[in-house]
Amino acid sequence: IDNCKTETNFFIDKDRIIKVNEELNKNNSYKIVIGAGSSGPTTRWGSSNFADLINNLNKLGDYFFFILCGPNEKKIENEISSKISKNNFLTLSDKTIYDLIPYLGISDMYVGNDSFGSHIVSQCGKKSIVFLLDAPKAYTDYSKNYYRILPEGYDINKITHGTNADPNLISVNSVIEVINKLKN
């Protein structure tokens, strides 16, 4: 989407942003929200894909990752964090929605499943890369900040609930290419 007449904006109190930046010691790394949580198993890219993505990005540059999963998705969070070779991440599953919003707001980008975090990051005016595995494009049609990645061989107009696309049809390398393109 080049221009969206209904583009929304999400504003976060400056004091809350300052507090989170202080907690992170004003970390100047490129901050990516890893949206590993989702509404169900058919919409998830998979913990091993996310861990591989993080480890590959760590070889390429200076990054910091916020791993976003719901409180009932700690297993996914642990599967990812246990495989990360560098200690440059923060898990957010123990935070309330109110408390985690500033972390999303200070991020530079969202990469992950179609979930609430992608909406917050895009509404903060940041790029939001979303994997459409089992969700219609309408979920991301409302913002110019969305970039959608589809499983190889799929038509965006034919993906909907019940598509159940194989998450491995989205390669880690293709995601890195999109990140690099949008980052610069």
Go through each PLM region and give its residues.
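Nucleotide-sugar donor-binding patch of glycosyltransferase catalytic domains
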Residues: 122-183
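Donor-binding and catalytic core of enzymes assembling or modifying cell-surface/extracellular glycoconjugates
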Residues: 47-133
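A short acidic, often aromatic-flanked loop/helix-cap motif at beta-alpha or helix-coil junctions
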Residues: 14, 96-100, 153-159
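Electropositive phosphate-/nucleotide-binding environments in soluble metabolic enzymes
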Residues: 14, 30, 47, 169-173
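Pocket-edge positions in alpha/beta enzyme catalytic cores
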Residues: 12, 42, 92, 164-167
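Surface-exposed, flexible loop/turn segments at secondary-structure boundaries
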Residues: 40, 73-74, 97, 136-137, ...
